[in-house]
Amino acid sequence: MKSLKVLACAACLMGTVSGVGFAKDVQTIAGSMVVPNNVNIVSASKTNTRDFVEKQMQQNPSKSTMTNMMAKEFFQNFGTNFDVYQLQGADKTGQKDAFVVAVDVKQIAQKVAKDKANDPMFVAAMAALDKGQIDPVTEQLMLGAINKQIPTTTTVVPLNDPKRYANLKTRSGELLIKPRTLTVENAEQVHPVAGTKYQTYAASSRLLYADGNVQTPLYANAAFVLKPGKPVLYVGVTTDVQRDYFKTIFDNAFKSIK
């Protein structure tokens, strides 16, 4: 819950940035991305979000020193290896908001999987990311393996195990840690996107995040852009009620990256 609060506060900080203006071509970590003229977008790396999050980590003694060190190193590459973008638009029903997270997959993989640096499969995967191209045979095998894991029906995924904390209760007898789940609905199969500068794969899904009795309907739209040497995963998230407004914006923005 602490991390969610930090993210929410960081989002508020992003929303208060003034003087951003409207833009059609927006620079992201993998290149320029096109958004409609009536959509305002701001990058978290260009705000004081980094300082805010680092301050929160310093004030949270429950985090281990190693965790804080890893997080600090992570934020040193804020705006280069990863970034968060806030999108704001509006229609006749009111203001619309969404977030896009961008992550350099190659850099993250190299940091997380250091122990696999000499593994032939890992080396081959890194070579493909450097080249920015996947051959048709490998593509079909990859998509087949990935899409087998994507639910074809509404599926509830548990995010924690409440039984582990069954003894932690409030004075009134309520569970201190509530069950958290993520329901996946109408999940789209991962597929190649035509008409892009770089090989791109995309998918989307409706989601329902539940924390006890509190439910949050969401919509996620993701694209993996294989820019040579800098493959980036983009994940756009908004509320489900704003899905129709942002779906086309996400689709076109990810497709336009160059």
Regions found by a protein language model. Give the residues of each.
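Bacterial N-terminal signal peptides that target proteins for export
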Residues: 1-8
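Bacterial N-terminal signal peptides
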Residues: 8-16
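Sec/Tat signal peptide C-region and signal peptidase I cleavage site
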Residues: 18-25
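Surface-exposed amphipathic alpha-helical segments
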Residues: 30-33, 39-40, 228-258
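N-terminal secretory signal peptides
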Residues: 35, 39-43, 47-50
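Conserved polar/disulfide-associated segments of primarily extracytoplasmic proteins
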Residues: 46-212
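Short, surface-exposed beta-strand/loop micro-motifs that present aromatic residues
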Residues: 83-89, 216-228
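Coil-to-beta-strand transition motifs
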Residues: 198-200, 215-217, 226-234
